[in-house]
């Protein structure tokens, strides 16, 4: 359906933006965790950031496939 095709394009854009916002938050809190002396938590949050960036590459691929 045409409506579904339009909707999925809108959703992909939304998901990418939302994911990017989360990624930036993870880095902010990773720095705070490191400052508080919790290196283990900081490393995990950095990994979450990196995984979020990887997901955004998949969203980019989905966006290209959608067009």
List where the protein language model places each region.
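N-terminal acidic leader/helix
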Residues: 1-29
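Short, charge-rich amphipathic interface segments used for partner binding and complex assembly
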Residues: 29-65
């Amino acid at each position: 359906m045409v409506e579904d095709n339009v909707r999925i394009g809108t959703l992909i854009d939304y998901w990418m933006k939302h994911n990017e916002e989360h990624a930036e938050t993870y880095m902010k809190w990773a720095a705070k965790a490191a400052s508080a002396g919790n290196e283990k938590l900081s490393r995990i949050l950095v990994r979450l950031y990196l995984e979020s960036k990887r997901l955004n590459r998949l969203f980019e691929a989905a966006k290209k496939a959608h067009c």
